[in-house]
């Protein structure tokens, strides 16, 4: 967990130094800060697997990078855009992938370990529904703020 916190705070501090826009940075990074608080509060009672903590860290880093540059202007993806002659910077697609995949993995782990839904087909259906609802909620918040 020390490496988790070290990487988390290193990227958080880096992302807060001269971002493209501080208000946008705050909006993009606040979910990562909330996630850290939730993880800290639940760590002793319900430890997640190393895989899940790693995926959460990767998702937080994606949010922090997007907050620092804005999703449309991440330099590596500008380079990729130019090399492959694309019309736009596709970093937001990485963010959307993480927004769907990481919550699905978290929900799956919690549901399996707590034995909430025993039938695999229903469990998988619920996880997909949860992630769709969570992502839709997140998009509504983004729309409301914009």
Task: Identify the role of each PLM range.
Residues 15, 56-66, 104-108, 130-142:
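Alpha-helical transmembrane segments of multi-pass membrane proteins
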Residues 35-42, 98-115, 146:
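Membrane-interfacial alpha-helical segments at the cytosolic side of multi-pass membrane proteins
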Residues 78-94, 122-127:
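Active-site-proximal inter-transmembrane loops
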């Amino acid at each position: 967990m020390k490496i988790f916190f070290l990487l988390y705070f290193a990227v958080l501090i880096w992302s807060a130094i001269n971002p493209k826009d501080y208000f946008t940075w705050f909006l993009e990074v606040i979910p990562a800060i909330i996630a850290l608080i939730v993880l800290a509060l639940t760590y002793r009672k319900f430890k997640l697997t190393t895989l899940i903590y790693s995926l959460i860290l990767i998702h937080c880093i994606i949010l922090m990078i997007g907050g620092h540059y804005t999703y449309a202007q991440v330099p590596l993806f500008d380079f990729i855009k130019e090399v492959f002659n694309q019309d736009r910077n596709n970093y937001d697609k990485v963010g959307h992938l993480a927004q769907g995949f990481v919550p699905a993995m978290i929900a799956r782990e919690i549901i399996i370990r707590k034995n909430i839904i025993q039938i695999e087909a229903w469990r998988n259906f619920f996880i997909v529904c949860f992630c769709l609802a969570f992502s839709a909620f997140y998009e509504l918040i983004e729309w409301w703020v914009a």
